[in-house]
Amino acid sequence: MNEAIIQLDHIDITFRQKKRVIEAVKDVTVHINQGDIYGIVGYSGAGKSTLVRVINLLQAPTNGKITVDGDVTFDQGKVQLSANALRQKRRDIGMIFQHFNLMAQKTAKENVAFALRHSSLSKTEKEHKVIELLELVGLSERADNYPAQLSGGQKQRVAIARALANDPKILISDEATSALDPKTTKQILALLQELNRKLGLTIVMITHEMQIVKDICNRVAVMQNGVLIEEGSVLDIFSNPKEALTQEFITTATGIDEALEKINQQDIVKHLPANALLAQLKYAGTSTDEPLLNSIYRQFEVTANILYGNIEILDHIPVGDMIVVLEGQAENILAAEKALHEAGVDVSILKRGA
């Protein structure tokens, strides 16, 4: 089992503005393992960005303990490292943002080289390093282009290369794909996954989009009003969300709410027969495809009319939703429901026939 490379224990962050006290983060504990792609999700103002800024102490907490790669960096209300040791620690932590923060008057390779200005490498070694980094992010042919000549996705690739210049062990992505179109977002996420695999990079993803968490992360924390309300593997959170906000994020990512609106307009649902019901089937790692639905027909003479189906592969395990009309004798439908539950399927009755 991987060890935690980031340990945030009982973190409080309080700001004082004139007569107001703002509790931005309240007693949050998060442990992130080496090699994780860890998502922190929440709406604007949830405290996500404020929390992760304590990892490299760009933001000092009010209370709590921070341990990064085995070193206690903050405890008992104060920084535990010397100024030099803190600078060194920060080099182990790269950051990318929604806004690329590239220098307009410098080329792509010059922007990356700027991150190496305090490096002990020789001039030749720095030049080779920059070439390697641009190759790593798939941008070597754009090395001499200025930011104005690059697309949004290409600018973010330069920013990623720059963030990796000092060989960090941790990369923090603060809404790094928010300004990108969906296609470019997928390409950047694929690049981050590749860097995670190739370099063993631990990535902390701050986002308000559960779709991004679903696409790239293996663990996720959900924040609301400065509080961590739910945390776990992406598989567990998607298959069994406990908090209302988490459920809201997941329905947005899966599109189930939009599907239900359309389904409710269909004649078959508007005029549901007395011996039928509309049900949502949720499952993780269980087959709810044709064989299982066929088996409830064979055993109980209950037919299943599939109106909607969505399946995702999370951590190599199928997780999905189906909306079906189950039709048959009342006692047979009850028996079919029980059989589905026993097969690991969560059955929610949305409407009963009149």
From Swiss-Prot:
The keyword Ribosomal protein does not apply. One of its GO terms (molecular function) is ATP binding. Keywords: Amino-acid transport, ATP-binding, Cell membrane, Membrane, Nucleotide-binding, Translocase, Transport. ATP binds at residues 42-49. GO terms for cellular component: plasma membrane. It catalyses: L-methionine(out) + ATP + H2O = L-methionine(in) + ADP + phosphate + H(+); D-methionine(out) + ATP + H2O = D-methionine(in) + ADP + phosphate + H(+). The keyword ATP-binding applies. Its EC number is 7.4.2.11. It is a peripheral membrane protein. Belongs to the ABC transporter superfamily. Methionine importer (TC 3.A.1.24) family. Part of the ABC transporter complex MetNIQ involved in methionine import. Responsible for energy coupling to the transport system. This is Methionine import ATP-binding protein MetN.
